[in-house]
Structures are given as C-alpha cells and as structure tokens.
C-alpha cells in the first residue's frame, strides 16, 4: 500500500514528483497532489471532541507496535534529530523490537573536508552532528541493545559519477547535486529481505505538525516537501514500504493530536499566535521557523535534550546544493562529479524548474477556535 500519497496529471497518477512535473510540462495540464485528506477529515468529523484525551506517548507506542505487528523487518532512518530520536526512544522504552537503524554518513569524503566542532551552527556544519550527536547514541546502543543492527551507509563511497538524464526523473524531488545522491540511497538489507519475500517498513520521522492561524481558527495541514524525503528509493521492491511515523493515514490521530497540543498551548499563550498568523507571517523567515521548531519539539516530544548540538536547517543555496552542501561544492573531491551533474542538470532544470521550489499542500484541517 502506498502510504505517502500521490500526484495526478490528467488521468495519470505518479508517486514520483519529478515524473509528475515532467508530465505536466509535456501535457500542459496541472499537477494535483493527494495525501489522504478524506482520512484526516473523516477522523476529525467523528472524533473532534475527543482530541486531547490520549497522551501522545501512548499514540507513539501504539504506532510502533502497529508497525511491529505488520512487518517482518523494521528499519529506522535515523538522523539524530528530535523526530527520529523520539521514534527510537519509543521502541526502546516500550521494549518493542526494532531490527535496524540506518544512518547516512559519507565518512570516506566527510573526514577530508571538515573537523568536528560545536562552534559553527550553520547548516554547512551538518557533518559535525554525526560526531557530536549520532555517534554517541549508536555507541550506547551497541552495548545496551546489541540485537539492533546498525548500518552506517557511506553514500559517496559508490559510483556517484553514474548520472544520466533518467537519474533526475527517478530522484523524485529536484533539490541539488547531493540530494540527488541522498534521496536514492537506502539500506541494502531491504534488497536482501525483499528477495526473501519479507515485508519491510522503511520508517521516517516525518513530521512535526504544520500550523496556521486565520479567521480566529487554528488549522493544521500537510506539505509534500518533507514527505519527498521518503521518496521513491526502493520503487522496485514491492515488499518494502516507506512509513511516515507521524503523518500516517493508518493513525491520523497522531498528527491531529500533535496539532491539538500546539492549539492548546496557543490558547494559554496567545502572544505566540503571531508566529502562525496567516496574515502576518513572511516566507523564508528562518528566525520564525526556528522558534516554531523549538516550541513544537517541547510540546510533542519528551525524549529530546535541547542541550544537544544541532545546526540550523538548510536553505536553498544554489542549483547545485543547499547551505548544508557548501563544503562539498568547494571541495576538489567532487569537481568531476559536479561536472557530470551540471551536464545532465542543464537539460532537466528547464523542465522541472518551470515550477521552481514548487511545494504542494493539502487543504487545511480545523483544530479549534481561538479568539485573539
């Protein structure tokens, strides 16, 4: 079952965003995005009055158990951030078996271009999060939970020069040279387990609730931007399924209860409403985004330590990459790769970037009334 929604162009459906955009350009028809709006609306229509009655930690436990009961093999894509860390702690604290933790860390190259430091908070220092945040967690797990397989995937230690025009279509989301690699990599045990006929859940920490305030009401909604991280990595493996832990149509109450937690906090702290006010918010306001991120983490997770090192979220930097990729873009190691990338990107950018930065959103779901 597809758990990440789909795009439609005319009478054709796509799980791949780039393929949909390409078809839209060729056929001159609009792209529509479907992400289970009927499921979330149906839940709210039947259960609006019960929001807030169940603790979020209990919902996280139920979600983890549901995944365990329905799959043979569970893989957690672990970034060390609050979303994936909360999933990890949910499995551990409730003694629900997790088969594998999958981490992307290109140590064969990264070790040459940076030294770990907690003094740089810009997204270009994303590499330090492995040394300062991820590795300590994995080292502890090796001792406390040796039954969990830990896979550290060196995503650049492969044939990264094998870029063809088709590569862009298959990537699912046009971001830049290094996302092109990241989005197509996955844990190799997926191939092994799939060939054995096993059902595999590829679990992603997607995502924190999106909130908007308008006309004295608080709404939540969904965006395809985060969902595309799950992408189309293992499209040929029918027994592998991308599972969004939080934004799941199988348990719509998780995302809606998270949104309700923010709504209740805004009721008690009305000065914060301006952060979400549709009429006053500015696009690409990084300061506002960071405030909301920290506020949300505090309200929906009790497993996160804010003293942990974290860099800023990456922003658009150039056609080749985001701010997290600054080191890669200037390093000799990738000169040849970028030449190959640019050669193929030149033909694709004119097609896909007819809709630059295009993000699709669902309709809004009303969480509650708030007279401010």
Where are these regions (language model features)?
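Nucleotide-activated chemistry modules centered on ATP-dependent adenylation/adenylyltransferase
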Residues: 1-74, 90, 96-372
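Hydrophobic positions on the alpha1 helix immediately C-terminal to the Walker A/P-loop
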Residues: 86-87
């Amino acid at each position: 079952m597809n758990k990440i929604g789909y795009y439609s162009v005319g009478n054709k459906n796509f799980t791949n965003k780039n393929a949909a955009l390409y078809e839209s350009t060729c056929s001159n028809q609009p792209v529509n995005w479907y992400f289970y709006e009927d499921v979330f609306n149906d839940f709210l229509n039947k259960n609006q009055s019960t929001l807030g009655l169940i603790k979020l930690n209990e919902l996280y436990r139920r979600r983890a158990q549901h995944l365990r009961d329905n799959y043979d093999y569970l893989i957690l894509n672990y970034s060390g951030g609050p979303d994936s860390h909360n999933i990890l702690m949910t499995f551990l604290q409730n003694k629900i078996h997790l088969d594998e933790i999958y981490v992307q860390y290109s140590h064969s190259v990264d070790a040459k271009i940076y030294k770990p430091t907690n003094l740089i908070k810009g997204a270009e220092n994303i590499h330090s999060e492995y040394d300062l945040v991820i590795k300590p967690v994995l080292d502890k797990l090796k001792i406390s939970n040796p039954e969990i397989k830990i896979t550290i995937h060196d995503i650049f230690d492969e044939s990264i020069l094998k870029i063809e025009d088709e590569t862009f279509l298959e990537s699912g989301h046009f971001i830049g040279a290094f996302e092109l690699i990241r989005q197509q990599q996955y844990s190799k045990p997926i191939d092994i387990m799939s060939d054995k006929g096993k059902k595999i859940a590829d679990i992603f920490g997607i995502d924190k609730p999106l909130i908007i305030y308008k006309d004295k009401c608080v709404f939540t909604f969904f965006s395809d931007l985060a969902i595309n991280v799950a992408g189309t990595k293992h499209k040929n493996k029918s027994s592998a399924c991308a599972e969004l832990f939080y934004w799941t149509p199988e348990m719509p109450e998780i995302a809606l209860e998270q949104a309700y937690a923010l709504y209740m906090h805004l009721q008690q702290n009305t000065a914060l409403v301006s952060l979400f006010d549709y009429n006053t918010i500015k696009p690409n306001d990084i300061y506002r985004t960071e405030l909301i991120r920290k506020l949300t983490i505090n309200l929906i997770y009790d497993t996160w330590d804010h003293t942990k090192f974290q860099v800023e979220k990456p922003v658009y930097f150039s056609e080749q990459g985001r701010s997290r990729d600054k080191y890669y873009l200037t390093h000799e190691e990738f000169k040849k790769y970028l030449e190959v990338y640019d050669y193929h990107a030149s033909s694709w950018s004119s097609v896909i970037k007819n809709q630059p930065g295009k993000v699709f959103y669902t309709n809004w779901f009303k969480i509650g009334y708030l007279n401010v």
